[in-house]
Amino acid sequence: MNPLLSFKDVSKGFEDVQILNEINIDIEPGYFYTLLGPSGCGKTTILKLIAGFEYPDSGDIIYKDKPIGKMPPNKRKVNTVFQDYALFPHLNVFDNIAYGLKLKKLSKSEIKRKVTEALQLVKLSGYEHRQIQGMSGGQKQRVAIARAIVNEPEILLLDESLSALDLKLRTEMQYLLRELQSRLGITFIFVTHDQEEALALSDYIFVMKDGKIQQFGTPIDIYDEPVNRFVADFIGESNIVHGTMVEDFVVNIYGQNFDCVDMGIKENKKVEVVIRPEDISLVSQNDGLFKAKVDSMLFRGVHYEICCKDRKGYEWVIQSTKKANVGSEVGLYFEPEAIHIMVPGETEEEFDKRIESYEDYHHA
């Protein structure tokens, strides 16, 4: 089956600034996708190109096997939920949601039925006659989502839609968005710079930097096997250290050999090693793979964040549910599976091929 939407070598610039560089993406129907990256990486520009608010300088945008790069927004089966909601302040909730349906000249009874259903979906039944000015940020966001889904788009675009909400409301809206996507089966494309939000919501994530896709995959794939230092740093906290591959399944870190699960990398190849803070355990000095001194400890609610310095002066961050005494000598321990090897300069295609070879090896 062909993708619902594809970008084929799409580039876009504004004046002298290149925003997107030969972007290639495929969007399958019925999944929740997230474009994740820092400000200025080009993620919102991709959304604008899908919606038809901007046109590509080069390359093709294909929707259901037809090019739509120059198609006007009103001809696309796409709706957008903006960060600032973009609601009409002079209209009540019902009329805001019904606006697009009235333009389509649907009957009053059909409009009422669709608006009522949309309000039920976003858990705002009974709010039809409320004025927009008197609503909270979370309620306005739900109205904006209802206005989008009532038109039954095939793709729903969400541009930093939760960033203006406080933490509790944002969490509630995350559950609502996942529930809506699952129930309606609409393809969601969500833009955010918040990696925790991306991990919680997405079926698939595109990690972006400087107008290019750095990595595409499921949240678990990207978190567990980042393709490069940028992705490892951007998706969660990481201990990133330099190493050298000794042979298959053995990496040398700062002069000490460690078992790992990586293979297919040239011997003596310089690599970068990622070990997540939650994968490191504080143990007795005798039980540790190496020794370290506790420098500091912060309570983060669900865990303690403990900073240690090993005897060679390198810092390690550990997330633990157990306290540690600042100044104490401890052992640090991690399993071979906790070590993730990154090869500098490796393309995503080369990286994916290497990871697939591990799976083939273990299934052989």
UniProtKB/Swiss-Prot annotation:
Instruction: List locations, semicolon-separated.
Output: Cell membrane
Query: What keyword terms does UniProt attach to this protein?
Result: ATP-binding, Cell membrane, Membrane, Nucleotide-binding, Translocase, Transport
Q: Its catalytic activity?
A: ATP + H2O + polyamine-[polyamine-binding protein]Side 1 = ADP + phosphate + polyamineSide 2 + [polyamine-binding protein]Side 1
Q: Which Pfam families does its entry note?
A: ABC_tran, TOBE_2
One GO MF term on file is: ABC-type putrescine transporter activity
Q: Could you name the Gene Ontology cellular component terms for this entry? A: ATP-binding cassette (ABC) transporter complex
Physiological role? Part of the ABC transporter complex PotABCD involved in spermidine/putrescine import. Responsible for energy coupling to the transport system.
Q: Record's PANTHER family? A: SPERMIDINE/PUTRESCINE IMPORT ATP-BINDING PROTEIN POTA (PTHR42781), SPERMIDINE_PUTRESCINE IMPORT ATP-BINDING PROTEIN POTA (PTHR42781:SF4)
Q: What is this protein called?
A: Spermidine/putrescine import ATP-binding protein PotA
* Gene source species: Staphylococcus epidermidis (strain ATCC 35984 / DSM 28319 / BCRC 17069 / CCUG 31568 / BM 3577 / RP62A)
Q: Gene encoding this polypeptide?
A: potA
